[in-house]
Amino acid sequence: MAYGYSYASCPSVIIPAVGINIDAKDICGALRIDNNRLWSRTPDRGDVVVFRHPVSGRDYIKRLTGLPGDRVQMKDGVLHINDVAVGLVDGGVFEELKASQGPLRATPRCENAPVGTGGICNKSRQIETLPNGVAHGILNIGSQQMDNTPVFTVPPAHFFFMGDNRDNSTDSRRRQQEGGVGFVPFENLIGRADLIVFSSAGRSMLFFWTWRSDRFFKSVE
């Protein structure tokens, strides 16, 4: 584990059919003391991180954009860290099919809307460069509410996360009380995501016709 071990490193075991609901805190609760982690190191800005939501307990995967003490703000769709805008250059157009995806059957939102089911959904792609030099692609579909935010000051031992699909992401830009992610404590980090082993657009992994083989065993950028 890139960041050591905490209670969040343990799995939750949920089998509704037989009444089993064992939370990770029940298995590794002894590690949940004062943000403690075993054999830990500090995450780097730009890491793609799997973490446990502080309220719902669900696993999320987002990019770490704010470290403890950072001031993070969005202005007109541009990320600002400690009052300085990050680097941003054009990265072309991202295309995908307008179709239901994943277990929740979510349909992508398109910059070229309206797009019918089965049509090509376009999103603007940009390359964002963070203060430490990490460059990665982000997607935008136009002016959105979260393109302008107040200043978020990251508390000690907490982190600020954002999705690369900026206009279709539930992340730290929205407070936990509003259904967002908010600030995530260090103890809730599970690990760094380095490799996509498997990808599917279907409701179940068994629906082989929805597998996205072009994404199998690809490095996470």
Predicted regions and their residues:
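Soluble "head" domains of membrane/secretory-pathway proteins
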Residues: 1-221
